[in-house]
Amino acid sequence: MPFALGQRWISDTESELGLGTVVQVEGRMVTVLFPATGENRMFSRNEAPLTRVIYNPGDTVESHEGWSLSVEELTEKDDLVVYHGIHSETGEKVSLRETLLNHNIRFNKPQDRLFAGQIDRLDRFGIRYQCQLLRHQLATSDLLGLQGPRVGLIPHQMWIAHEVGRRYAPRVLLADEVGLGKTIEAGLIIHQQLLTCRAERVLIIVPDTLRHQWLVEMLRRFNLRFSVFDEDRCVEAFADHDNPFYTEQLVICSLELLRKKKRLDQALDADWDLLVVDEAHHLEWTEEAPSRAYQVVEALSEVVPGVLLLTATPDQLGHESHFARLRLLDPDRFYDYDAFLAEENSYKDVAIAAEALAGESKLSDYAINSLTELLSEKDIAPSIRLIQAEGIDSELQQAARSELLQELLDRHGTGRVLYRNSRASVKGFPKRIFNAYPHAMPEQYLTAARVNDMMGGRKSLEAKAAQALSPEKLYQEFEDNSASWWKFDPRVDWLIEFLKSHRSKKVLIIASGADTALSLEEALRTREGIQATVFHEGMSIIERDKAGAYFAQEEGGAQALICSEIGSEGRNFQFASHLVLFDLPLNPDLLEQRIGRLDRIGQKNDIQIHLPYLQDTAQERLLQWYHQGLNAFELTCPGGHILFSEFAEELLNVLVGGDEDELTNLLNHTQSRYKELKHAMEQGRDKLLEINSHGGDKAKAIVERLAQSDQDTKLIGSVIRLWDIIGVDQEDKGENSIILRPSEHMMFPTYPGLHEDGVTVTFDRDTALSRDDIALITQEHPLVQTGLDLITGSDTGTTSVAILKNKALPAGTLFLELIYMADASAPKSSQLYRYLPPTPIRILLDKNGNDLSAKVDYTSFDKQLSAVNRHIGSKLVTASQPILHPLFAKGEEYAQVAVNELVAQAREKMTSQLTGELERLESLKAVNPNIREEELEYLRNQMQELTTYLDASQLQLDAIRMVLVSHV
């Protein structure tokens, strides 16, 4: 390379250094000073990664004094270029030596980089274009936020997430029956809200025992990095901010922390966008005396726009508490309990009409009259005639049914506020098989019971029943706490033999208390050396997680996990299918929670429930009440709480000392009431809720589309190529997985999310679901999003020169391929990308300025091209400059026309969608008070803002590829 002192060069590898000046040429070395940063670089003269900067007539250059020059002519003196042209401020003709050019010039624009000789590799141009297409594809998907999470594609979960996640500030109660995946539904909604920037700050409130589990679930399933806050963390965070909650965007904490006034005040002041409350059935409320827990959540719900309440049992603490939870979501709507009860009674007619529409038979006169009355503001006669007609296309009839059903759901009930799926409406659950094992009552327990009776003392019926149900605890009271009751209890003997005969099976054992759980572990370990681990309230969260992980290990793990009652709240072990109930809880909801640890959607085997019990005791009588009265072992019993509250006194009397006649009467009354309640619960709003909550055919369609996306081989190829070009090491691990590691030759110094020790990933959802240590890669995964951002946020691939070997065209024929981006600057929370996402516009010009892009598609054109090295490419660009400048102007004209069309389409789409949604909600608000004014106001404001942003849309040249025809 010919170097001379004072010449201006730019570094091909460190363009951020700005414009360099040659300060020394000695022997085979050249030294360049980069004044903008004050750094020197020494290069070999023959292999220097440098490009000479020479501007051309028509360019504008800036002097080191700040004024600009419009270049008209170039001359050369002493190997230095002198620019002649018009001074930007005075209008006079002036000259400027290249030595006096502004040092801070950086060639970020593709044209500048092209003419400065900064030519990228051919494959980098291709990957940049592919990255822009992927970003556009993701932004325009109406399933954004549902593809990325590592969860099974279960229709009702995807439907709820799709419906709720795209709302502004959703306020809903997720109340699916136990085992249907409320945590996953909440995670999907959170993920969607964050990905679309409808929310940025999220607070999750959970019981102490579930904080770490939520932390792990959010990270492992949804790639969301929450922080757990306790008192110690708040004190520690005070060093960074007066309000510790401002130090993180995504926070998990317990209700216990927020019971403290100081912490609650700080949480109230922390500008959350979304509040999530798990186990919301613990929020007890009466009008006269709301619980402290309820008051905490109520205060937060008044200042946080979005609220998700999770509860498996809306009526667990009574119907009044269920009303109170709805009141948290919308106090204007649910203002009076009596009015709420009266409204619920009216749901029966709605449910009958909805069920008729959901079926396939002709509508009865009663159903038609009900529909006409319920939808009185709408003329439904044409739809009714279509449904009732003979010989009509069944698809048309089904469409009419669906339309009326949607109108019904929109206008009546709590469908927008409450989502509740029952097992009756969701398929995919295993059978529950109940096995009972009777044993004689040990003499030691009988003696302890007699002594207890002789001592007398005042005790409540419930306390007496608890003693009768757990004779080992009573025995310990009279002996001592270390009494080895497990040495003679026949249930323990049975348990040991059962585990020995099922050595290859994982077995979950649940007992009511921690002491019992610890004693059982000691018995299994000391008597037979059986590997078991315990899980109880006396353990730290980390200890519990370790116990759960030890139990989950297939090789070398514990055969049995012994839990106290807390083990049946929030923890899931569906990889096991054997459940041993060492005793029975008095509350049927707790029994269902115990069984629900294994009986969950996704369980692949039938659940074997084993109950060893002592004959002729309270244990046997409670077993009979659960099994014969409620059928609670083999089926879920959603009305269990109601039945327990109605028969509590009668049941307690039978448990403490009732005779056979009293037991028989209790069982008969319970069975009769159970049937009544079951029939009643099949009527009214539950059916209406289920129709709205599981999504039907629409939910199935969403899942089918997501499954098709999972099989998109083009995406897999694009992502693998992206990692190849960035320089990520990829090691095939087998089992549909690869290990990604950063390499020394990566294009970028860091790749956020890619750790030094690597990460194992898969594109196969089933593989990811079966292996907690393997990440599921979709276009929503942070590793993919980061890769796209690294490429599109840098100048990688913005310029390229290629050769087209085609003898049908004259040698030297030139083509100019331009990639423009149509974009508008707007906060992501505005949702502008739904209508005008960053859109790549491809223009392919011949030398006469004709756009050939419609005739020559990108892929087929790209396959015919060959790369050239940077130096040859730079020379070809320099030689072609007279042709290129007018082509750039022509390309911008074509692109501007395309942008104008995109903006017009975006404006039309936005106006149509938002006006339609606004009109729909305004008309619904007249008949369904569940429509909140905040949602309407949000839509009105959004239309105004989006119009402003669209008017300011811009066109930006993103990448250039110059192609020359060669016959060589």
Swiss-Prot record:
Keyword Transit peptide attached: no
Enzyme class per UniProt: hydrolase
E.C. no: 3.6.4.-
Gene Ontology annotations of biological process type: regulation of DNA-templated transcription
SUPFAM superfamilies: P-loop containing nucleoside triphosphate hydrolases (SSF52540)
GO molecular function terms attached to this record: ATP binding; DNA binding; helicase activity; hydrolase activity, acting on acid anhydrides
Family listed: Belongs to the SNF2/RAD54 helicase family. RapA subfamily.
Full protein name: RNA polymerase-associated protein RapA
